[in-house]
């Protein structure tokens, strides 16, 4: 892809915000691993997911020098930089022990496993996500003609389970719901039991 894009003078911006939240010991590849990718690509990552700094608005970009310089210039028009204590916290996280990253990854992987297994017992087969703190789950056959919004509403009213309807993410999200892996395993199991009320 990178070689082809050079021919057409196209740049690639890669969002790798969930780079460290991967499962089954299979980290996602970086576009910058591709030969000559730095000639056309910039990769962004966020401290939000890896270090639980959501809302702190801090991350970094690496890649094509000219694009990074342009990004720096544009950013200077938008703000004056991140609050100093946030920068110090981010530097401390990056330079400190990374055991917390492994721990967070392990917690999300365990929650993912519980979600997939317990929902399957409740009649809803969810493919096992390979990464991130979300499961992108196909809506059951019973709801395919009714849509993701109806399914999400029924989950809320009949099972007391909150999910995001796929349609909220655009037309290609229809047919799916997004489930956050942010609750503990006991709550995930309880949610799966409640899903049985829908008789999927």
Walk through the language-model features, giving the residues of each.
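PLP-dependent class I/II
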Residues: 4-200
